């Protein structure tokens, strides 16, 4: 009889226990996101230079301090980032600290890349004040319409760039129209304050204005860009990007810089400064194959570039100066040539027309987190080019290994044929935490 009662009580007690437990069930509240974030990025970079000792830039740079046929360069950098959110306000900080053991000298550099406060009084309005990165344009290798962008490295998209000191206003509005779905306006005010704020734009006290009108029209992203100020040409630009299919997208940019300065140098070393309206434009495509290979191709017309004859004169002057120095031993000749050509070599590309192509393959042979690639940049006027094979590998979380080799190819008197390196392997490791 006791066994019978025992078997009857067990399911009753289990049911009662379950019912009682249900009365005390409670939902575990979701963890609130932290109002702050901190991050660090460490990078070690090694570069091997195999010099072209006959190239004009090498002769001008190292005639008074010959490094030999090759040299090693090492860089180590730390980037510290932080963010804070308090209601509708957000603050961000990004600092860059780099030590370089170069071919001729060593140096330590400390820069504030970003440091700004952002206020969002409504979902449609954002106000920024401070130093913030400006990344406009749709081009991959070039951005002719992005007048405020810092020069970027198309083969290193994760590279952080220094921002601009500004006061910014962003307005965004979603629409329900059939054609126009979104519209946005960005207005930037950029002051020049002595050496620490936008000094590369103009003189102390100058004030610059930039606008970008964004439209999402028939599934096409369009930007209309304006930039003007006392020390820069008035500039007008437009860019677009559109997905034609899930695996193919097109993009383009066009820009007009009005009354822009243009410096030329002839075979005798005489310089002339002209003013002209410079049209630049870019058209590109991005294609993803069924085997996860990505192909990017771009054509770029550089309105500020030089025709083939102008480049011939530019390199002929340097060759003449080098011959005079070799025959007379007068170093003042090369010092003068180095000073006169410095502004030209500060330009990323000297020519008029370029073609860029990059092919990357995701995880070939089932090697996880490994992407090899190859890129080529061709000067379509003198047919010299730069070939760059490389790879990116992420062997573990937050660790990235990169390798690339720059190989400039072309005869003397051409843009890439006169590069100071015959080839330049480069490897860098990044660790995030």
Regions found by a protein language model. Name each.
Residues 28-59, 89-93, 183-187, 372:
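Transmembrane beta-strand segments of Gram-negative outer membrane beta-barrel proteins
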Residues 44-52, 86-88, 95-101, 133-135, ...:
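Transmembrane beta-strands of outer-membrane beta-barrel pores
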Residues 87-93, 124-127, 176-185, 217-224, ...:
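Repeated loop/turn-to-beta-strand initiation elements of outer-membrane beta-barrel proteins
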Residues 237, 249-366, 374-376, 416-418:
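Extracellular/periplasmic loop regions
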Residues 76, 81-184, 188-190, 215, ...:
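Outer membrane beta-barrel
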Residues 70-76, 108-113, 161-165, 205-209, ...:
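Residues that define the transmembrane beta-barrel architecture of outer-membrane proteins
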Residues 40-42, 93, 129, 169, ...:
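Membrane-embedded beta-strand positions of outer-membrane beta-barrel proteins
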Residues 355-359, 405, 419-433:
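Outer-membrane beta-barrel "beta-signal"
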């Amino acid at each position: 009889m006791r066994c019978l009662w025992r078997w009857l009580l067990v399911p009753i007690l289990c049911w009662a226990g379950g019912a009682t437990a249900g009365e005390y069930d409670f939902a575990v509240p979701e963890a609130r996101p932290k109002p702050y974030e901190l991050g660090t990025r460490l990078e070690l970079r090694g570069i091997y230079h195999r010099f072209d000792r006959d190239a004009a830039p090498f002769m001008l740079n190292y005639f008074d301090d010959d490094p030999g046929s090759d040299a090693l360069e090492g860089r180590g950098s730390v980037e510290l980032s932080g963010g804070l959110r308090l209601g509708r306000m957000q603050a961000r900080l990004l600092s860059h600290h780099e030590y370089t053991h170069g071919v001729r000298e060593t140096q330590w550099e400390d820069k504030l890349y970003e440091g700004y406060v952002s206020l969002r009084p409504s979902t449609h309005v954002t106000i920024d004040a401070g130093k913030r990165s400006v990344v406009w344009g749709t081009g991959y290798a070039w951005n002719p319409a992005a007048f405020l962008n810092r020069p970027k490295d198309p083969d290193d998209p994760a590279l952080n760039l220094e921002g601009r000191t500004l006061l910014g206003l962003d307005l965004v509005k979603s629409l329900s129209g059939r054609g126009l779905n979104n519209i946005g306006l960005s207005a930037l005010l950029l002051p020049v304050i002595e050496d620490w704020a936008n000094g590369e734009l103009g003189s102390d006290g100058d004030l610059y204005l930039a606008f970008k009108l964004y439209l999402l029209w028939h599934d096409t992203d369009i930007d209309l860009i304006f930039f003007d100020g006392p020390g820069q040409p008035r500039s007008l630009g437009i860019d677009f990007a559109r997905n034609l299919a899930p695996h193919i997208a097109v993009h383009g940019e066009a820009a007009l810089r009005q009354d822009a300065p243009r410096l030329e140098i002839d075979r005798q070393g005489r310089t002339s400064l002209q003013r002209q309206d410079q049209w630049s434009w870019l058209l590109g495509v991005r294609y993803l194959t069924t085997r996860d290979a990505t192909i990017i191709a771009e054509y770029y017309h550089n309105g500020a570039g030089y025709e083939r004859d102008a480049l011939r004169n530019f390199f002929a002057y340097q060759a003449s100066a080098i011959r005079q120095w070799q025959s007379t031993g007068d170093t003042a000749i090369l010092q003068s040539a180095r000073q006169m050509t410095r502004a030209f070599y500060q330009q990323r590309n000297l020519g008029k027309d370029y073609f860029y192509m990059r092919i990357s393959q995701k995880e070939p042979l089932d090697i996880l987190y490994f992407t090899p690639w190859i890129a080529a940049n061709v000067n379509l006027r003198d047919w010299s080019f730069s070939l760059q094979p490389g790879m990116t590998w992420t062997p573990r979380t937050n660790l990235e290994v990169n390798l690339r080799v720059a190989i400039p190819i072309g005869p003397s008197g051409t843009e890439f044929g006169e590069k100071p390196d015959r080839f330049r392997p480069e490897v860098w490791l990044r660790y995030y935490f």
